[in-house]
Amino acid sequence: MSSKIIKENKRLVLDLYKRCLYSAKRCPKYQNQMMMESYIKLKFRSNKEIHQKDFETIENLLKQGEEELKSMNDFHELRAKSKSGQDHESILNDCFDDDFNYIGSTPTVKK
């Protein structure tokens, strides 16, 4: 049973890593791409020594990584909306509730 969990966790970590690197490549400036790529590699390397059976820590780190990835992708969506000419007020309405709490960018950008 635990070997299946270990294998699945490895798959999830690798998938998250690839999606993070892909998101970094979406940064408009090469310098920002390289900075984000370095940050991603550093974060993953710093957690490489976590024991593969420390399921709770791995789960928490995966959640953290997914949240950071969502933030990066939200930034890309906002940038795309801004470039497409969408007004700033509607962009902000997509990202914040009435109390100005961040809720993320939910609508998809049409290309």
From Swiss-Prot:
The keyword Zinc does not apply. Plays an essential role in the assembly of succinate dehydrogenase (SDH), an enzyme complex (also referred to as respiratory complex II) that is a component of both the tricarboxylic acid (TCA) cycle and the mitochondrial electron transport chain, and which couples the oxidation of succinate to fumarate with the reduction of ubiquinone (coenzyme Q) to ubiquinol. Promotes maturation of the iron-sulfur protein subunit of the SDH catalytic dimer, protecting it from the deleterious effects of oxidants. May act together with SDHAF3. This is Succinate dehydrogenase assembly factor 1B, mitochondrial. Interacts with the iron-sulfur protein subunit within the SDH catalytic dimer. Pfam families: Complex1_LYR. The gene is sdhaf1B. GO terms for cellular component: mitochondrial matrix; mitochondrion. It comes from Dictyostelium discoideum. One of its GO terms (biological process) is mitochondrial respiratory chain complex II assembly. Belongs to the complex I LYR family. SDHAF1 subfamily. The keyword Amino-acid biosynthesis does not apply.
